[in-house]
Regions:
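Short helices/loops that flank or line small-molecule/ion binding pockets
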Residues: 3, 20-28, 108-125
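Extracytoplasmic/periplasmic substrate-recognition and gating elements
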Residues: 2, 130, 137-167
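Glycine-centered hinge/linker elements that transmit conformational signals in sensory
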Residues: 22-24, 68-104, 150
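Stable alpha-helical elements in mature extracytoplasmic
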Residues: 3, 14-21, 43, 47-50, ...
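Bilobed periplasmic-binding protein-like "clamshell/Venus-flytrap" ligand-binding domains
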Residues: 27-42, 96-97
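Periplasmic solute-binding protein
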Residues: 1-11, 19, 37-67, 162-167
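A local structural motif
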Residues: 6-10, 90-107, 120-121, 139-144
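Paired acidic/hydrophobic, glycine-rich loop segments that form the ligand-binding mouth/hinge
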Residues: 34, 123-127, 146
Length: 167
Protein backbone atom coordinates (compact mmCIF):
# COMPACT_ATOMS: atom_id res chain seq x y z
CA UNK A 1 0.00 0.00 0.00
CA UNK A 2 2.84 2.42 0.76
CA UNK A 3 4.39 2.08 -2.72
CA UNK A 4 0.96 2.65 -4.24
CA UNK A 5 0.17 5.67 -2.08
CA UNK A 6 3.70 7.11 -2.31
CA UNK A 7 3.35 7.13 -6.10
CA UNK A 8 0.04 8.99 -5.80
CA UNK A 9 -2.10 6.11 -7.05
CA UNK A 10 -5.61 5.47 -5.80
CA UNK A 11 -7.80 2.40 -5.91
CA UNK A 12 -9.77 2.37 -9.17
CA UNK A 13 -13.55 2.51 -8.93
CA UNK A 14 -14.26 1.17 -12.43
CA UNK A 15 -12.57 -0.89 -15.12
CA UNK A 16 -12.11 2.32 -17.05
CA UNK A 17 -10.25 3.72 -14.02
CA UNK A 18 -8.14 0.55 -13.77
CA UNK A 19 -7.06 0.88 -17.38
CA UNK A 20 -6.29 4.57 -16.85
CA UNK A 21 -4.24 3.67 -13.76
CA UNK A 22 -2.40 0.99 -15.74
CA UNK A 23 -1.50 3.57 -18.39
CA UNK A 24 -0.53 6.16 -15.76
CA UNK A 25 1.88 3.77 -14.04
CA UNK A 26 3.52 3.06 -17.41
CA UNK A 27 3.70 6.80 -18.20
CA UNK A 28 5.33 7.35 -14.80
CA UNK A 29 8.03 4.82 -15.73
CA UNK A 30 6.69 1.97 -13.61
CA UNK A 31 5.24 -1.42 -14.38
CA UNK A 32 1.62 -1.88 -13.38
CA UNK A 33 1.23 -5.65 -13.27
CA UNK A 34 2.96 -8.81 -12.14
CA UNK A 35 1.33 -11.71 -13.99
CA UNK A 36 2.47 -15.31 -13.91
CA UNK A 37 0.67 -18.19 -15.59
CA UNK A 38 3.36 -20.82 -15.08
CA UNK A 39 2.32 -23.95 -13.21
CA UNK A 40 4.24 -26.91 -14.64
CA UNK A 41 1.90 -29.21 -16.54
CA UNK A 42 -1.02 -26.95 -15.65
CA UNK A 43 0.57 -23.76 -17.02
CA UNK A 44 -2.08 -21.29 -18.04
CA UNK A 45 -4.72 -22.01 -15.44
CA UNK A 46 -4.40 -18.56 -13.77
CA UNK A 47 -5.53 -17.06 -17.08
CA UNK A 48 -8.88 -18.78 -16.61
CA UNK A 49 -9.51 -16.64 -13.52
CA UNK A 50 -8.72 -13.50 -15.49
CA UNK A 51 -10.92 -14.53 -18.42
CA UNK A 52 -13.81 -15.48 -16.15
CA UNK A 53 -13.53 -12.14 -14.36
CA UNK A 54 -13.44 -10.31 -17.69
CA UNK A 55 -16.40 -12.35 -18.94
CA UNK A 56 -18.41 -11.23 -15.90
CA UNK A 57 -17.40 -7.62 -16.58
CA UNK A 58 -18.16 -7.57 -20.30
CA UNK A 59 -21.16 -9.90 -20.57
CA UNK A 60 -24.37 -10.55 -18.69
CA UNK A 61 -24.56 -13.25 -16.01
CA UNK A 62 -26.86 -15.15 -18.38
CA UNK A 63 -24.16 -15.17 -21.07
CA UNK A 64 -21.59 -16.32 -18.51
CA UNK A 65 -23.93 -19.16 -17.50
CA UNK A 66 -24.37 -20.18 -21.15
CA UNK A 67 -20.60 -20.24 -21.50
CA UNK A 68 -19.89 -22.52 -18.56
CA UNK A 69 -22.79 -24.77 -19.63
CA UNK A 70 -21.16 -25.07 -23.09
CA UNK A 71 -24.17 -23.43 -24.75
CA UNK A 72 -21.90 -20.91 -26.48
CA UNK A 73 -18.54 -21.95 -27.93
CA UNK A 74 -15.17 -20.86 -26.61
CA UNK A 75 -14.60 -18.90 -29.82
CA UNK A 76 -17.87 -16.98 -29.58
CA UNK A 77 -17.55 -13.19 -29.86
CA UNK A 78 -18.48 -12.83 -26.18
CA UNK A 79 -15.67 -15.12 -24.98
CA UNK A 80 -13.17 -13.67 -27.44
CA UNK A 81 -14.00 -10.19 -26.10
CA UNK A 82 -13.24 -11.37 -22.53
CA UNK A 83 -9.95 -12.93 -23.66
CA UNK A 84 -9.06 -9.69 -25.42
CA UNK A 85 -9.75 -7.77 -22.19
CA UNK A 86 -7.25 -10.00 -20.37
CA UNK A 87 -4.87 -9.44 -23.27
CA UNK A 88 -4.99 -5.70 -22.69
CA UNK A 89 -3.23 -6.30 -19.37
CA UNK A 90 -1.07 -9.33 -20.20
CA UNK A 91 0.01 -8.84 -23.82
CA UNK A 92 1.45 -5.33 -23.59
CA UNK A 93 5.15 -5.47 -22.68
CA UNK A 94 5.08 -2.25 -20.68
CA UNK A 95 2.13 -3.44 -18.59
CA UNK A 96 3.83 -6.54 -17.18
CA UNK A 97 6.98 -7.11 -15.14
CA UNK A 98 9.40 -8.91 -17.44
CA UNK A 99 7.31 -8.05 -20.50
CA UNK A 100 4.50 -10.00 -22.10
CA UNK A 101 6.87 -12.83 -22.98
CA UNK A 102 7.43 -13.56 -19.29
CA UNK A 103 3.76 -14.06 -18.47
CA UNK A 104 3.58 -17.76 -19.41
CA UNK A 105 7.02 -18.64 -18.04
CA UNK A 106 6.67 -16.89 -14.67
CA UNK A 107 5.39 -19.31 -12.07
CA UNK A 108 2.16 -18.06 -10.53
CA UNK A 109 3.61 -18.63 -7.04
CA UNK A 110 6.54 -16.32 -7.81
CA UNK A 111 4.57 -13.70 -9.73
CA UNK A 112 3.55 -11.43 -6.82
CA UNK A 113 7.11 -11.05 -5.50
CA UNK A 114 7.76 -7.97 -7.64
CA UNK A 115 5.31 -5.99 -5.53
CA UNK A 116 7.61 -6.39 -2.54
CA UNK A 117 10.87 -5.17 -4.08
CA UNK A 118 12.16 -1.63 -3.67
CA UNK A 119 11.49 0.02 -5.98
CA UNK A 120 8.53 -2.19 -6.86
CA UNK A 121 8.81 -4.22 -10.06
CA UNK A 122 5.02 -3.98 -10.27
CA UNK A 123 2.18 -2.37 -8.36
CA UNK A 124 -0.69 -4.80 -8.88
CA UNK A 125 -1.34 -8.52 -9.07
CA UNK A 126 -4.57 -10.40 -9.81
CA UNK A 127 -4.94 -13.88 -8.42
CA UNK A 128 -7.10 -16.15 -6.32
CA UNK A 129 -7.61 -15.45 -2.63
CA UNK A 130 -4.94 -17.97 -1.61
CA UNK A 131 -2.08 -15.95 -3.15
CA UNK A 132 -0.95 -14.38 0.16
CA UNK A 133 0.43 -17.81 1.10
CA UNK A 134 3.11 -17.12 -1.54
CA UNK A 135 3.94 -13.59 -0.33
CA UNK A 136 7.33 -13.15 1.31
CA UNK A 137 7.52 -14.40 4.88
CA UNK A 138 6.51 -11.75 7.37
CA UNK A 139 4.26 -9.86 4.95
CA UNK A 140 1.56 -8.05 6.87
CA UNK A 141 -1.72 -7.84 4.97
CA UNK A 142 -3.11 -4.34 5.10
CA UNK A 143 0.37 -2.94 5.71
CA UNK A 144 2.76 -4.54 3.21
CA UNK A 145 0.06 -5.66 0.77
CA UNK A 146 -3.58 -4.85 0.35
CA UNK A 147 -6.43 -5.80 -1.92
CA UNK A 148 -9.10 -4.08 -3.96
CA UNK A 149 -12.10 -5.27 -5.91
CA UNK A 150 -11.49 -5.97 -9.60
CA UNK A 151 -13.88 -3.26 -10.75
CA UNK A 152 -16.66 -3.55 -13.25
CA UNK A 153 -17.12 -1.21 -16.19
CA UNK A 154 -18.95 1.97 -15.25
CA UNK A 155 -20.37 2.11 -18.76
CA UNK A 156 -22.08 -1.29 -18.51
CA UNK A 157 -25.04 -2.21 -16.36
CA UNK A 158 -23.68 -5.51 -15.04
CA UNK A 159 -23.53 -4.78 -11.33
CA UNK A 160 -20.46 -5.73 -9.30
CA UNK A 161 -19.78 -9.37 -10.13
CA UNK A 162 -17.70 -11.61 -7.89
CA UNK A 163 -16.12 -14.85 -9.06
CA UNK A 164 -15.89 -17.67 -6.55
CA UNK A 165 -14.57 -21.19 -6.81
CA UNK A 166 -14.19 -24.21 -4.63
CA UNK A 167 -12.71 -27.65 -4.57
Amino acid sequence: PDNFADAGYTVPESMEDLKTLTEKIVADGGTPWCIGLGSGGATGWPATDWVEDMMLRTQSPETYDKWYKHEIPFNSPEVVAAIDEFGYFAKTDANVAGGAGAVASTDFRDSPKGMFSSPPQCYMHHQASFIPSFFPEGTELGTDADFFYMPAYAGKDLGKPVLGAGT
